[in-house]
Amino acid sequence: MTIFVHIINILIFINYIKMKQICGLFVASLAVLASCAKQEPLVIVPCQIWPDNNGVHVNAHGGGVLLHDGTYYWFGENKCDTTSLAMVGVDCYSSQDLVHWTNEGVALAVSDDPESDITRGCILERPKVIYNEKTGKFVMWFHLELKGRGYEAARAGVAVADNPTGPYTFIRSGRVNPGILPMDLDNEEAKARLAEIDYYTYDESKNPQAEEWWTPEWRADVDAGIIAERDLEGGQMARDMTLFVDQDGKAYHIYSAEENLTLNIAELSDDYLSHTGKYIRMAPGGHNEAPAVFFKDGTYWMITSGCTGWAPNAARMFSAPSIMGPWTQYDNPCRGENADITFGGQSTFILPYGDNFIFMADIWRPKHPSDARYLWLPIQFDENGVPFLEFMEKWDLNTFKAVAD
């Protein structure tokens, strides 16, 4: 009888333990469900006023976002109400969630020294910042045009800081890789072709009988490198640009060259402060600007725009197995109404967000530059893994899905 009682007690204890475990799992499940239910939506509203912590529209145009130590830093052009000239410099904002932004002030200020390359009234566009793990420095590159010279200078500028919010110290500006041929032209066949042609043929400023641009013959000569050779001694032109840090830590400067006709992808030095001389021409003669790059599942993707000034146009898209190519062009990645004008925007950056990617673009307002808006959209992928974009009036960062009104 005593043994029987012990057995009963043991069974009751075992059953108690099991029930406790089940209850624990049930409570944990309820906690997870409650957590999900309480998760606040992080809503992105494209094309509208985006207020910062002071209730003022974010002023960071043509910019990019850096994630560092769990904080996002958004850098962009500070634009004034009446001019697109650089009267202030590059602004910086910080955020923990990509929705609510704190104004951190001016990261790179223009100079009051009239002899400085970045003197007040220059053109300073498309600033991007990357962090160098080896040096512990934050490096900013940007497109620079010297004051009073329009878009003639076509320079790249570089600045550096010890902290993400700055202040950034301007180092220098100039054209890129002077005296060095791009990799695709540095071979005997390409050099022989270049020896047969001369930019003077198309130079209206020096040749009264100059031949017209945009003919099939002109396009063939551009493809062959006639403008790259013209700019060889002084360095390649560098206008609209972005930066990209690859999986191995190498960084690349990607910019519009050759009168905006051709993109260059140039490797940066280990400290990210200069170029190594290794670079390629991409889509020669294609007239691309506003490059934005990301990497997914072994493929490099780039979205660009055409060249129509402040007016929007159809986006272009390219992919490659290596950052140095070869690059293959795709159709316009945008779908739906206003796809032919990229929903009114122009690409500036693609931001990785977990396993997802955010397409960042600007909606320019040239008559009121500071009122330019931001077009942020989730990048989607079709059944073949090809990226595409659809406009959403509102969408949630938690789900990457549209939010109903």
Residue ranges, per PLM feature:
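Bacterial Sec-dependent N-terminal signal peptides
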Residues: M1-E40
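Carbohydrate-active catalytic/glycan-binding domains of CAZyme proteins
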Residues: F13, C36-D405
